[in-house]
UniProtKB/Swiss-Prot annotation:
This is Serine--tRNA ligase. Homodimer. The tRNA molecule binds across the dimer. The lineage of its organism: Bacteria, Thermotogati, Thermotogota, Thermotogae, Petrotogales. Pfam families: Seryl_tRNA_N (PF02403), tRNA-synt_2b (PF00587). The keyword Ligase applies. CDD domains: SerRS_core. The gene is serS. Keywords: Aminoacyl-tRNA synthetase, ATP-binding, Cytoplasm, Ligase, Nucleotide-binding, Protein biosynthesis. Catalyzes the attachment of serine to tRNA(Ser). Is also able to aminoacylate tRNA(Sec) with serine, to form the misacylated tRNA L-seryl-tRNA(Sec), which will be further converted into selenocysteinyl-tRNA(Sec). Consists of two distinct domains, a catalytic core and a N-terminal extension that is involved in tRNA binding. SUPFAM superfamilies: Class II aaRS and biotin synthetases, tRNA-binding arm. GO terms for cellular component: cytoplasm. PROSITE patterns: AA_TRNA_LIGASE_II.
């Protein structure tokens, strides 16, 4: 959420930023209009309350002077004023509800260093690591390899749940768990994160504070009875962990790593990545999350991104880092790096992690503050990143580590977790 005062004082700057993101700018005019109406109503209510208070004092004075008839007239006026106040307060609530909703619909402002562009085609490649493997045989796509080895069952998953679900079997299911444990061990032991296992169901307030609502309502699974939401990412739970709290300066940065399944309706992705495990309604992810100060958040993004990269490096999976342009930024992000891993079946790089600095966007939505060295209250800056998407990491291993005789070699770092060197 953006600061209302900042919007009021810098409407043109905000509009220019929204234009760079390919967003409509009329919402800023609506916000300013609601804000002006709100301030006008507040002034009217304040004036009437002052008049009512003055009348109360006058009534007491008149009664002391035995002027009961005059006092009764003032009392009647007071009741009329109270009714006016009640009506204006009702109008004020409606205006404030509309204003707050509009504020929740405004995306974050891109950082000054973000490349300007319309869509993913104008993202900027920052660096590459590793070299795609040159096969001396025709590599198989993970969906074919997994089916032939009786490790992936798409048909029975569809029978159970419909499209975009997968059953993992045998050693490939164990490899999924090995990846999760490997990532958690790396981030806690080497990178200093605190491990969290959060709830998968959260309240509307929680998922609103992270930025998923109201914009992504159609992409979320929701319970009809209790109005609870299944998380689309552990970022939702971690961003709400300290909602309505004030953190001490010396406690920052707070660094959390969480493992959860993630649930997404993928409402806008019809026809995309229809085969295999790349785009699923349910998938496992290890999430990295920081709470820090405005002074440290830019450098924190570089550090968080390097932590996600380390997973790929230790697994010896070729990847590239891409800086997202303004038109491809996520709703809550001020700056984002995507990590894209090489997949032979696509003969291309595919996203496996998205690392973002949201600045005070989530802190303001969740009312999460900290006391600085001068004991002043400020909103925290938050950062998030996949460390990594487990299913896509599994896919990358299957495709990049496959052998000519149809087996899957296990990366060296995962052998201690698996107790074997090959699957198949």
């Amino acid at each position: 959420m953006l600061d209302l005062k900042y919007i009021r004082e810098n409407p043109q700057e905000i509009k220019e930023a929204l234009t760079k993101r390919n967003n409509e700018t009329s919402i800023i005019d609506e916000i300013i209009s609601f804000d002006e109406e709100r301030r006008k109503l507040l002034q009217q209510i304040e004036t009437l309350r002052a008049q009512r208070n003055q009348n109360s004092k006058l009534v007491a004075k008149l009664k002391a002077q035995k002027k009961n008839d005059e006092a009764e007239e003032i009392i009647i006026q007071g009741k009329e004023i109270s009714e006016q106040i009640k009506n204006l307060e009702s109008d004020l609530k409606n205006i404030e509800d509309n204003l707050n909703y509009k504020l929740l619909c405004v995306p974050n402002i891109p950082d000054s260093g973000v490349p300007v562009g319309k869509d993913e085609n104008e993202n900027l490649e920052v660096r590459r690591w590793g070299k795609p493997r040159e096969f001396d045989f025709e590599p198989k796509a993970h969906w074919d390899l997994g089916t032939e080895l009786n490790l992936l069952d798409f048909d029975r998953a569809a029978k159970l749940s419909g499209s975009r679900f997968t059953i993992l079997k045998g050693d490939i299911a164990r490899l999924e768990l090995a990846l999760i444990n490997f990532m958690i061990d790396l981030h806690t032991k080497d990178h200093g994160y605190t491990f969290i296992l959060p709830p998968h169901l959260v309240t509307k307030e929680t998922i609103t504070s992270s930025g998923q609502l109201p914009k992504f309502e159609d992409d979320l699974y929701k319970t009809s009875l209790d109005q609870m939401y299944l998380i689309s990412t552990a970022e939702v739970s971690l961003a709400g962990l300290h909602r309505n709290e004030t953190l001490e300066f010396n406690s920052l940065p707070l660094k959390y790593v969480a493992y959860t399944p993630c649930y997404r309706r993928e409402a806008g992705s019809y026809g995309k990545d229809v085969r295999g495990m790349i785009r699923q309604h349910q998938f496992d992810k290890v999430e990295l999350f920081w709470y820090t100060t405005p002074e440290e958040s830019s450098q924190a993004l570089e550090e968080l991104t390097s932590h996600a990269e380390k997973v790929l490096q230790l697994l010896n999976l070729p990847y590239r880092v891409v800086a997202l342009c303004t038109g491809d930024l996520g709703f809550a992000a001020a700056k984002t790096y995507d990590l894209e891993v090489w997949l032979p079946s696509y003969n291309d790089y595919k996203e496996i992690s998205s690392c973002s600095n949201t600045k005070d966007f989530q802190g303001r939505r969740g009312n999460i503050r900290y006391r600085d060295r001068e004991n002043k209250l400020n909103f925290v800056h938050t950062l998030n990143g996949s460390g990594l998407a487990v299913g896509r990491t599994l896919v990358a291993i299957m495709e990049n580590y496959q052998t000519a005789n149809g087996k899957i070699e296990i990366p060296e770092k995962l052998i201690p977790y698996m107790g074997k060197e090959f699957i198949g």
